[in-house]
Amino acid sequence: MDTNNDIEKRILELAKQQVSPIEYENYLSQLKYNPNASKSDIAFFYAPNMVLCSTITAKYSALLKEILSQNKVGMHLAHSVDVRIEVASKVHVSDHSNINYKATKSSIKDSYTFENFVVGSCNNTVYEIAKKIAQSDTPPYNPVLFYGGTGLGKTHILNAIGNHALEKHKKVVLVTSEDFLRDFLKHLNNRSMDSFKEKYRHCDFFLLDDAQFLQGKPQLEEEFFHTFNELHANNRQIVLISDRSPKNIAGLEDRLKSRFEWGITAKIMPPDLETKLSIVKQKCQLNKIILPEEVMEYIAQHISDNIRQMEGAIIKISVNANLMNAPIDLNLAKTVLEDLQKDQAEGSSLENILLAVAQSLNLKSSEIKVSSRQKNVALARKLVVYFARLYTPNPTLSLAQFLDLKDHSSISKMYSSIKKMLEEKNPFVLSLKEEIKNRLNELNDKKQH
């Protein structure tokens, strides 16, 4: 007669043969056979929480019935067997104290705190929500998603939450979606998913940057879905950062969009001139650089919205003044900013331009490469041409092949169309131009590093 452990093992082995590895890891491997409640015509199983219980019942109860009806698991069963899956009243929880959550400190930037986050009307709501999250012992809102354009302080606020939570001796994981994917694939290939789950599903604060990059990766979305469910079911704080609202993340599964909106969503707006000037002054103080008031005002007025670019401009002005042994004045600032903005965008690849335009218009890159009558796609193709003409060498032939244009004269028409809209100060296109430039600068920065 087989032992209860043998029976459970055999059931799971048979189930494992009929589902994908990721399905088995995320669902069926979580089941525990309950011999005390089971009878000849009904088999009871435990799942660790209600989310898994409901999911396994809906997706896999028929499979389990089929396995049991084959009567190959060493049980005395009736011809027809029912399956019941319940939430365990007392699920054995392993000791997670040995997980080195302190190691995640290296992924959290000490310099990003609430104390040095410049607050203005553009970000006050996000700041207050973030402080409340960090200071609370239980999640006041869950999940929380902050979104907004590049360089507006989203990563700063995420790190500030992490730093404050660490001061309270909380277990914190801060990770980008790219690193989450890399870690997931490593553990999957090494068949060490248990340690992956230990790390990500048992922290007090799960902080994810660049959540928009989860889209289009089915395995990653599947794993994140279950990580999210378990964290949420166990009342662990989830904070997500994205460059756009959940509904505008093209290609993201609807079930993830839905979960992202369960709690609270808040947008970081571009800073107004007063806030930008405060940021410039703070960055000067942090970098121990003294600039005349008129130079700080000029930087605030002429750097669009990107805080990282403001800091880069401050440092470059100071360096140039030292190298030239010249005073820091308005003329120097104008020269440096003109060169800086030109340098940041020059050398952009067509791929980066395409990606920046696609992200700004919430399209897939593949959609833009094919001619279409859809207005947003047609506009996107014109914008790719415009930026390619500005920032890539000899773009005509490359562009024709890249966008599948048979007539090279089309490139001139598309470029002229955007140029005319900018000259007419079309507000939508002007806004798009700044957003695309910011995204290009960020993509180019990543390439350099």
UniProtKB/Swiss-Prot annotation:
Residues 322-449 are annotated as: Domain IV, binds dsDNA. Belongs to the DnaA family. ATP binds at G151, G153, K154, T155. It is found in: Cytoplasm. Disulfide bonds: none annotated. It comes from the Bacteria. PROSITE patterns: DNAA. Its main location: cytoplasm. Oligomerizes as a right-handed, spiral filament on DNA at oriC. NCBIfam families: DnaA. Coiled coil: none annotated. Residues 75-106 are annotated as: Domain II. GO terms for biological process: DNA replication initiation; regulation of DNA replication. Residues 107-321 are annotated as: Domain III, AAA+ region. PANTHER family: CHROMOSOMAL REPLICATION INITIATOR PROTEIN DNAA (PTHR30050:SF2). It comes from Helicobacter acinonychis (strain Sheeba). Pfam families: Bac_DnaA (PF00308), Bac_DnaA_C (PF08299). This is Chromosomal replication initiator protein DnaA. SMART domains: AAA, Bac_DnaA_C. Residues 1-75 are annotated as: Domain I, interacts with DnaA modulators. GO terms for molecular function: ATP binding; ATP hydrolysis activity; DNA replication origin binding; lipid binding. Keywords: ATP-binding, Cytoplasm, DNA replication, DNA-binding, Lipid-binding, Nucleotide-binding.
